[in-house]
Amino acid sequence: MSEQLPLLIELGTEELPVKALPGLAQAFFDGVLAGLEKRGVAVTRGDAKPLSTPRRLAVLLPGVATEQPEQRSEVLGPYLNIALDAEGKPTRALAGFAAKAGIDWTALERTSDAKGERFVHRAVTPGAQAAALLPEILREAIAAMPIPKPMRWGAHEYAFARPVQWLVLLFGDTVIPAELLGVRGDRITRGHRFMHDGDIALAAPGDYIDALRAAHVLVDADARRARIVEEVDAAARQAGGSARISDDNLEQVVNLVEWPSAVLCSFERAFLAVPQEALIETMEINQKFFPVLDDGGKLTEQFIGIANIVSKDVAEVAKGYERVIRPRFADAKFFFDEDLKQGLEAMGAGLASVTYQAKLGTVADKVARVAALAEAIAPQVGADPVQARRAAELAKNDLQSRMVNEFPELQGIAGRHYAKAAGEPSEISLAIDEAYQPRFAGDDIALSPLGKVLAIAERLDTLAGGFAAGLKPTGNKDPFALRRNALGLARTVIESGFDLDLPKLIDVGLASLPDAVKPHADRNTETVRADLYDFILDRLKGYYADKGVAATHFNAVAELTPASLYDFDRRIDAIGIFATLPEAEALAAANKRIRNILRKVEGEIPGDIDTTLLREPAEEALAEAVEAAIGDTGDALHRHDYVAVLARLARLRPQVDAFFDGVMVNADDPQLRANRLALLKKLGDRLGSVAAIEHLSS
């Protein structure tokens, strides 16, 4: 086994794209490791990970073998009867084989197999030096990096994410003499652009992280992240509040700085009259600042900026940040004030001139459909239908507001504020906001009954219209986000415990569409309904998989196509509990056997069991047990207590096992055969009343 040495590779660049930086760092790291592995060079990875700052991408590995392992090869040659003539001299076949191997035939070895003895060429080739392999490995790694917009600079023909300024290639204490992207490898790196003068000569790779830290560079993104959180929290406590640190904002800031330093800033209290969501949006999205909240979660007039330098005059840095934010806040206040003057209801007039989709009419048309759906759904879930209609009629009006035009992410949120200002009931203003929930994967569903109704109605219209208009997603194309809408609808129904009949709701949604896209003879309501139902179930499959539900459990319930998604969920829970019972596997296998037997039956199976035709003790016992189980589970089925149903059915296992062990189903006597099939059908129907449990059979 060859010696291992630490390896350091650093590409020093101009400032790299913030959003692309994590992906570039990971791809560079993975590419180097893959190149070493492909060539059989042993690596001790330890806790190594991608290292990066806005000005560098680095790979630091604690141990890399100095050379490849020996390469052993074996090439089989001709058999002796072909290789040697009668005098034992080499034939042309053997001479050619030896020449191809590059040795004299007398140096060849011999081996035997079932056909006889033959010549073989065995060779041991020394492994290549890792230092000689690294330049090509790096070129491959760089070529495979996901660079969004490659740049060219100077007179060079090559391209990279940003111009490369320096290159560290240090293997042990030795520089690898190679050139990449127009720069020769060296041991010289650079510190912070403003806080460190001069180059840094590295004696060995192990010096890298500490040497850069001394030069005011935290090359580990995790270290920068921890420092930012620590400093931001401390600054917020100093202001008497707590910082809002969103993951997205934090990641952006981590990749903007090399030596983060928190700066506490403030703005005029008058701006707090603007909805805080707009101010937070401005701070986080536009400026990458961290808002400071009070104990009640309300925005204060303080915020925190992250400088890429420890300034001697922090107050001056704060003033600069405050100068930047002030005009943006002034714009937001202007938009808000102007919108209030117009009023939420008046904004809706413009929706009639905005096309929602060519076949589905204007946004105003969509609003009317959603309002009708909301009014129809509300009484089914205990919400006020009048308020549901009113909330739906106002829910899209803020799309015409100046605020949403500037901050699209505030749709619904802005509407809530404008509805409140207009004196609408709090239930309506909240529902206008909650109609958009869940806004993204992992987001909460709406909390209020009215918000849930609007969320369901909005998504139902979007899905019904999309499928009727032929907009079903294909591949990566989903311009109307039908996949997200399907999951949002399903989650809202299930997590709210709403026992709604989905096929009937789909029919209502389809019936309200424009005549041009309504189901017709060539593609009737039943076809569109089934297509959309299956689409929603397909989204649910991923939802349950994320929750750890086995695919077999999902398929067992899906086969029954429950009309209610909430009922679907209860069946999923019940089948999960049933699967843990010791009787589950045997009953699942039995039900599978029953299905296979009944599938082959020609003609009608009797609906009732004739007790006078029960000949065997095992079939008598099973018939009695099945009738008892049907009687015991009827009420539980009616109450949707599926756990109780399956627990009771599990007690049938002894009788089921005894029946299949001792009774011939396909008896010669047609009356006996028909009666036994009737017994199996009754048993199978009840075993499959909660889910197609045969899916649990391995």
UniProtKB/Swiss-Prot annotation:
Cellular compartments per GO CC: cytosol
SMART domains, A to Z: DALR_1
Keyword Oxidoreductase: no
Family matches, as SUPFAM superfamilies: HD-domain/PDEase-like
Keywords: Aminoacyl-tRNA synthetase, ATP-binding, Cytoplasm, Ligase, Nucleotide-binding, Protein biosynthesis
EC number: 6.1.1.14
MF (Gene Ontology): arginine-tRNA ligase activity; ATP binding; glycine-tRNA ligase activity
Main EC class the enzyme belongs to: ligase
Catalysed transformations (reactions): tRNA(Gly) + glycine + ATP = glycyl-tRNA(Gly) + AMP + diphosphate
Entry annotated with the keyword Signal: no
GO annotation (BP), single: arginyl-tRNA aminoacylation
Transmembrane annotation, as ranges: none
Locations listed in the record: Cytoplasm
Classification via PROSITE patterns: AA_TRNA_LIGASE_II_GLYAB
Superkingdom: Bacteria
PANTHER family listed in its UniProt record: GLYCINE--TRNA LIGASE, CHLOROPLASTIC_MITOCHONDRIAL 2, GLYCYL-TRNA SYNTHETASE
Subunit structure as annotated in this protein's UniProt entry: Tetramer of two alpha and two beta subunits.
Family in the record: Belongs to the class-II aminoacyl-tRNA synthetase family.
Protein name: Glycine--tRNA ligase beta subunit
The species this protein was found in: Xanthomonas campestris pv. campestris (strain B100)
Lineage: Bacteria, Pseudomonadati, Pseudomonadota, Gammaproteobacteria, Lysobacterales
